[in-house]
Structure formats: C-alpha cells, structure tokens
A protein has these predicted regions:
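Short catalytic micro-motifs in class I SAM-dependent methyltransferases
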Residues: 88-92
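Activation segment
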Residues: 76, 93-94, 126, 149
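Conserved N-terminal segment of class I S-adenosyl-L-methionine
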Residues: 1-85, 96-103, 108, 136-144, ...
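Short, glycine-/aromatic-enriched active-site segment of Class I SAM-dependent methyltransferases
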Residues: 117-137
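Short glycine-dipeptide loop
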Residues: 109-114
Length: 186
C-alpha cells in the first residue's frame, strides 16, 4: 500500500499550487484525497459506472471533488484544468488508443498546465504476476513514455520509482515510471 500512496503523494507535490485538477482513471479513488487536499477543485473521471457511484458515496465528505463517467479516449470534460494526472491507466489501453488518450488529455489542459502519466515499466514486466501481465497490455519503457509525451509537450521530465522511492535514477532499472509534461506544443 505504501508504494501506491507514494505515487499519489508525488502527484500531489508536483501539482501543488494548481487550483483545478483532473484525475484520469480514478478507479476506487484510493489516493485521490491526498491530491484533493491542495486543490480548489478536482474532477475524477473513470469509465466504470460502479466505481464512480461507489466513490460518490464513499468520498462524499470531500467537498472539492466531483466524479464523472467519462472515457478520455472518446470525450473530454467541459472545462480545462491547471493539472492532470493519470496513474496506472495507460498500460490498460490498447496501444492504438495512445493518441486519443494524449490528445484528449491535452484538450482539457491549460496552456501552462502540467500533465503526469504514471505506468509500470516494461522492463519490470518479467517480474510481474500472471494477472498483471494479462491486464497490462500497453506497458511503456522510460524511452517510449518520454517519446509519447514529447509529441504533445515542450518539456518532459522523467522520474523513476522503486518501491516507494521516486527518483531520477537509471530508467531501465525502475519498477514504475512517471512522465511529467509541461508546456503544450502548439
């Protein structure tokens, strides 16, 4: 659990000072409160109605958070955001959806916004469980995540993660990767 919460803590720190934030693929909203505490407004979206309904009930005391059923590959929210984060989502999408995922994410990001994409590293896949291997159909490497995000952002900062430690060390040895996109390309 600690390593999962560390991912959200990283996003919370990077997005600190951003007022309006979008979480793409909120799932069960596990780490969402950590990011929401520094935001004026946080919209959490997911494709699963059951998760959205469960989050609306379970996390209703967090007043600055709204949940909506939106598939970012097909539609965008009706507002723009200072920051976007997506943890453990892109690896579950068919690779042909990378373009629509990134393009639609960028459509709802302000020009000076920050976009964080987190995913397990393909180089760690040989140590993954069978279940993980079956579900993770679109893993990225340090290079392929940077290359993807560089198509949409002027600056891409790459971070690696091992256990709960986020660092800038050698990407191929990381279990998990973060790409932080800054400055939308025109």
């Amino acid at each position: 659990m600690c390593f999962v919460l560390s991912r959200y803590k990283f996003c919370a720190k990077i997005l600190e000072g951003k007022k309006d934030i979008l979480e793409i693929g909120c799932g069960d909203g596990f780490g969402l409160p950590m990011v929401a505490q520094n935001a004026k407004y946080l919209l959490a979206i997911d494709v699963d109605d059951r998760l959205i309904e469960g989050n609306q009930e379970r996390l209703k005391k967090i007043k600055n958070v709204e949940f909506q059923n939106i598939n970012i590959c097909e539609a965008v929210p009706d507002r723009v955001f200072d920051g976007i984060f997506s943890i453990d989502v892109i690896e579950h999408l068919d690779s042909h959806l990378d373009k629509s995922f990134m393009e639609n994410s960028c459509k709802c990001l302000k020009e000076n916004g920050i976009c964080i994409v987190g995913t397990p590293n393909i180089t760690a896949n040989k140590y993954a469980t069978h279940r993980s291997k079956v579900q993770h159909i679109n893993l990225k490497s340090h290079k392929t995540l940077r290359d993807l995000m560089s198509q949409y952002f002027e600056n891409v900062l790459m971070f690696s993660m091992n256990d709960e430690v986020v660092h800038t060390g050698y990407g191929p040895m990381a279990h998990y990767l973060f790409g932080v996109g800054i400055g939308l390309k025109k």
